[in-house]
Design a protein with these regions (language model features):
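Residues at beta-strand starts and edge strands
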Residues: 18-20, 64
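A broadly conserved detector of short glycine/acidic/proline-rich loop/turn motifs that flank catalytic sites
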Residues: 7, 30, 72-74
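Helix-rich interaction surfaces within compact, conserved domain-sized segments
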Residues: 48-98
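Acidic, aromatic-enriched beta-alpha/helix-loop junctions
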Residues: 30-60
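Short, charged/polar N-terminal "headpieces" of proteins
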Residues: 1-18
Length: 98
């Protein structure tokens, strides 16, 4: 099952000048657990997908949600920043199989 089909919400946003967050929200605990346990959503695999050294995975079981914190390649708003609001950075995860 693709992440886009399993999650109710997949969004990314600016989290300060040096980080972007991706929020994954699921309808129920089963979908949340499936995503949290999926090897394709491990910190190492996501870091590789985004071309960064590491990412942080923060689960929120009470909300059936997962937050992924990704370091920005460049400071928000600086020359070379192509997405100052970070709103388009969730795209690489949409078709991930979980």
């Amino acid at each position: 099952m693709r992440l886009r089909d399993a999650a109710k919400v997949i969004r990314s946003k600016n989290a300060g000048p040096t980080e972007i967050t991706v929020d994954l929200m699921f309808n129920d605990a089963a979908g949340f657990a499936r995503a949290l346990e999926a090897p394709s959503l491990s910190a190492g695999v996501i870091a590789q997908r985004y071309g960064v050294q590491s990412v942080r995975i923060i689960p929120y079981p009470a909300a059936n949600a997962i937050k992924i914190v990704i370091p920005r390649a460049t400071t928000a708003g600086s020359p070379g920043d192509t997405d100052v609001s970070g709103a388009q950075q969730h795209r690489p995860l949409l078709d991930v199989e979980i």
